[in-house]
Amino acid sequence: MSKHIYVYSPSGAVRDKAAFRRGIKRLTALGHQVEVDEAALASHLRFAGDDATRLAAIHRAAASGADVALISRGGYGLTRILGGIQYKQVARAINKGMLFVGISDFTAFQSAVLARTGGVTWAGPSLGEAFGMAAPAQPDEIMAACFDDLLSGQGEGAGWRQPAEGRAAAADTTKIIANKPMNTGPGGTFSIKKSTLWGGNLTVLSSLLGSPYFPQVKHGLLFLEDVAEHPYRIERMLTQLLHAGVLGQQRAIILGQFTDYKLVPHDRGYKLQSVVDWLRSQVKIPVLTNLPFGHVATKVLLPVGAPAQLLVEGRDAMLYWG
């Protein structure tokens, strides 16, 4: 199953060039035709080239005819250039079957594409972090399997198990949303159908609020993740989305992985679970946790902007979009 994969850098400059080369080599060894953008290793300040260079890279990716347009890494930089993206060109590429894949700062591109065109992109790996590790380490099996499923057109959903604390919370949501047509049962069993799956990195998404690049999704399934953000900062960004009315317009909030932060003595017991508990007290919709997506090795791929169905039975959750 050979695919044409176009690798480009729309955000931060590639810092680990060895990992970049290893990622290219791995994808090539899998039988794929890997095309590297001419500016993939460009550098300007902390960016992969100046704004014009990175815009041109996006447009070259869209015009490449590749099956997959895969970012080299995240970082920062896409919010600077959202106003210059040729969204009609990107939409044409998506309509022809191109799969735009990325994570982290790529949330800005995905949100803007959804807001401006309704096009579906994929939250998933970047080249370096997912495929660029040094031997004997190998790409995570679950991530690699999901990536293969995407390339073969076989990916139809993702399942996971919430931590034990989620059992009671899931059961509570059945009463809250019982006025909606859904399957209910013991232990917090319910389903939510025909809802737009959207979201990504919480910091990036919240930074777009109030702009024309923030998707106006109602009755959606909002998934969120972040890295190196203390729980109080996560709560602050969630509060912004809450006060703006975004969270109350969704059918469910699905929290992924929030990693690489450090608690301090001043927190006095305040932790990520405190944020989850607070969020559940503020909204009248299910709040699920532990989605295997974020700045972690083990992650699923998610279609941003696609209609999806959420099934929950006790601690077990499943997203279907196929």
Residue ranges of predicted features:
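ATP/NTP phosphate-donor binding region
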Residues: 1-65
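N-terminal amphipathic/basic leader segments beginning at the initiator methionine
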Residues: 1-22, 159, 165-181, 318
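Charged helix-capping and loop-helix junction motifs
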Residues: 49-54, 87, 236-241, 267-275
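N-terminal glycine-rich "phosphate-gripper" loop used for MgATP/nucleotide binding
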Residues: 68-84, 103
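Short, acidic/small-residue loops that bind anionic groups at enzyme active sites
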Residues: 87-112, 116, 120-127, 286
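Conserved anion/nucleotide-ligand pocket segment
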Residues: 120-203
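Internal helical hairpin/lid segments
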Residues: 210-265
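ATP/nucleoside-binding phosphotransfer catalytic cores, i.e., glycine-rich phosphate-binding loops
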Residues: 255-322
